[in-house]
Amino acid sequence: TYNNADDSGLHFTVEALVNGSARSCDVVLTEKNAPDNSEALTVNINITQKPKGLIECVADMRRSRCYFPFLKNGGALNSLKNGTMEALVNIQETRVSGSLSTIMGVEGKFLLRLGDVNVPWNQIQLAMQGGNRTDTKLKLSELDRWYHVAVTWDDTFAYFYIDGELLYRTGISNYSGFNLGVAYGGSESDYNRAFWIGYAYNADRFFPGYMAEVRVWNRTLTKEEINAENHFYSVPVDSEGLVGYWKLNDGAGHIIKDHSPSGNSMLGEINVHSSGGQQIGDPGMNWVEMSLP
């Protein structure tokens, strides 16, 4: 309901939403004292009111990364003979052919990313010690669009999902299980070669957009579980098999809380770049207010 206008602006009264449903209205402003022989100016404004989202903040991962300063419970991320990695991602800018963009994982061991030499820059790839896995059906074709991506695996196959649709299955050699909770040899950073979000090997392999709801499980989620109501946007923190859960919704500072029982919180860095053979950055994270779904 319109109330009045003064030098500070227009004033409306808005009632609470009923049953959480969204609503909107159009407001037309018309100039009252138009100059002689001039048509009055009009401005159309659309006002939308909707319930609070399950997600209210995300991380802009461009030239940014998340890492473990130490692992409170590294064992929870090891020996993953069965498992799932999943995240919400939103590409904000295109990259040149041959670019690599990291979602999460360990360089040279088990890494979920986009692109590669001879792989389109926006195509999902699982880079493994025993060889890389990808398929032309795994492209994230639209900019500024949220996608839920998930890779699940057992001791025989890896399964690739986009927005809950199983698009590709491929054989893998899992051996005794993948270890995401240890550091490996590698001189590309002060923190060694380990599990990162949004980074691997060098500063140019950042994710070119927003990320949220990054999760690691020690079991192979089913298609039905991935497509459960609101699973893309939130899961109970005590869910069976949830061993890593970084919502990337912290909103301030650079501590990235692990909401899973493992308690392996991360730190964020921005302005990541190469200097003297090291890949370094500044403490921080670029937070973006955004309501999802």
Residue locations for each model-derived region?
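Extracytoplasmic low-complexity segments
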Residues: 52-64, 75, 171, 228-293
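Extracellular glycan-interaction patches encoded by glycine-rich segments
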Residues: 129-130, 183-212, 227-235, 293
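Short, aromatic/His-centered strand-loop micro-motif at the edge of beta-sheets
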Residues: 124-148
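Extracellular glycan-recognition modules
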Residues: 54-125, 157-158, 201, 219-226
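Surface-exposed binding patches on compact interaction domains or structured appendages
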Residues: 1-13, 122-123
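Localized edge beta-strand/strand-to-loop motifs within extracellular or lumenal beta-rich domains
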Residues: 145-159, 219
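Short, solvent-exposed beta-strand-to-loop segments that form ligand-recognition rims
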Residues: 163-192
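Extracellular, beta-strand-rich glycan-interacting domains
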Residues: 83-93, 204-232, 243-252
